[in-house]
């Protein structure tokens, strides 16, 4: 939603939400989320905490983490972002996906993609410490993604139904796609 996006841009401050300054010296994040729900070899390229680039965060800190690759879908086009965890274990059990039983657990509650195609994982470090250069397991909440996919498909069905019933002049003007609801904006004449 707009408030969350504004807060995300505000959190970056002068670090360049547009991607001009933020991560200019690093490659774009590779999105692997169409093929994988979890990967165990994501490298931490950058960390931002309290509006500053930092080398390390410790438990209890809110931060933005940029990875070299990610299975997390970023918020865009009205579709909300994936949630999940960055952990230190390749164990894909439910406990690991919830960040339990690991020395390191970073809960991801928002993901934004900047103009430089860096995926910024917003969240809180629940346990341990996380450093630039660390390799982590990145795991999405698969139930949440499935619910978002259903809502996304519903927007396409709604668009087709409106065009069939009201005519070809109907056009989608926007949408909001979340796990538990969707909003479909359209123009009619």
Q: Could you say what each language-model-derived stretch is?
A:
Residues 1-189:
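A glycine- and charged-residue-rich anion-binding loop/surface
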